[in-house]
């Protein structure tokens, strides 16, 4: 309780500065799932996919009996597809703005106005998602109000600040505009797929969450061949002159998230920021307490 009272939240500007300057590290969010309701998993996936991070991937580790209905797997594909349009829009806007502002110090009013318009569009996208989400229980309320609309409210504040700078004819630094565009790109850009360890004879069959996670983590960074054997399909490292069937993602950071949990905005940013502070070089794991849903 005393630590909670004394805790001071890292200002947003410090996060922006830390993750600027071509920050290129990645994070992989692993969601172990065992016979979960598809809608429960979908909310978890969305809360992870909307995390703001330079290189983000969300992997659903399905541990149901082999060959399930795959409703959970469809949820992660659905999220990836829905994010594609805003991600493309904001990536294009970022790149065009960077080219237009090359070698300039202050952003033109038209550029600031366009950035405000893009922040309004991003907020509207999230608000529409919340407005059309079917509310069935208190976790749906939490998802819509805290995950979707919470992020939208944050983006609305930036839109308001940009519009006020135009009204007051205030200088807006070029680097700040580019930071703001980078934030939009990171929020709406995420890779996603699923993995089922029970499809392979070479991965652990122990019936617990830890081994579900470890089965995937142990393969990260490997180039693998899918091989049919008398015991079933196995995954093995490729041999010299072989072409891999799978090149498994690797990343500097891994975040594990229960399939019935949700992340609030900035969660990944703030955890990684703490791990990268001077004096924390030997820190390997960081854990945060979580709260139950109201209701």
Model-based region annotation:
Residues 1-4:
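Alpha-helical membrane-embedded segments
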Residues 8-295:
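Internal catalytic domains of large membrane-associated glycosyltransferases
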């Amino acid at each position: 309780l005393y630590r909670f009272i004394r805790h001071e939240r890292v200002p947003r500007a410090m996060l922006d500065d830390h993750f600027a300057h071509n920050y290129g590290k990645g994070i992989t969010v692993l969601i172990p799932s065992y016979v979960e309701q598809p809608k429960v998993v979908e909310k978890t996936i969305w809360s992870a996919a909307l995390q703001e991070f330079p290189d983000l991937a969300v992997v659903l580790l399905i541990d149901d009996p082999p060959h399930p209905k795959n409703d959970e797997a469809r949820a992660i594909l659905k999220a990836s597809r829905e994010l594609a349009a805003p991600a493309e829009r904001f990536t294009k806007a970022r790149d065009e703005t960077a080219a237009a502002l090359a070698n300039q110090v202050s952003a033109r009013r038209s550029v600031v106005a366009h950035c405000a318009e893009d922040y309004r569009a991003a907020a509207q996208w999230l608000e529409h998602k919340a407005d059309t989400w079917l509310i069935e229980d208190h976790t749906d309320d939490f998802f819509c109000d805290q995950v979707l609309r919470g992020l939208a409210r944050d983006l609305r504040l930036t839109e308001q600040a940009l519009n006020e700078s135009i009204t007051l004819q205030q200088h807006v630094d070029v680097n700040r505009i580019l930071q703001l565009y980078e934030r939009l790109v990171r929020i709406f850009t995420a890779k996603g797929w699923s993995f089922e360890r029970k499809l392979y004879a070479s991965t652990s069959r122990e019936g617990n969450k830890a081994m579900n996670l470890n089965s995937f983590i142990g393969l990260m960074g490997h180039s693998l061949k899918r091989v049919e054997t008398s015991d079933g399909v196995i995954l093995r490292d490729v041999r010299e002159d072989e072409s891999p069937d799978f090149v498994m993602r690797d990343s500097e950071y891994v975040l594990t998230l229960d399939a019935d949990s949700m992340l609030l905005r900035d969660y990944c940013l703030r955890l990684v920021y703490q791990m990268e502070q001077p004096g924390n070089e030997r820190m390997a794991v960081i854990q945060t307490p979580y709260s139950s849903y109201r209701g």
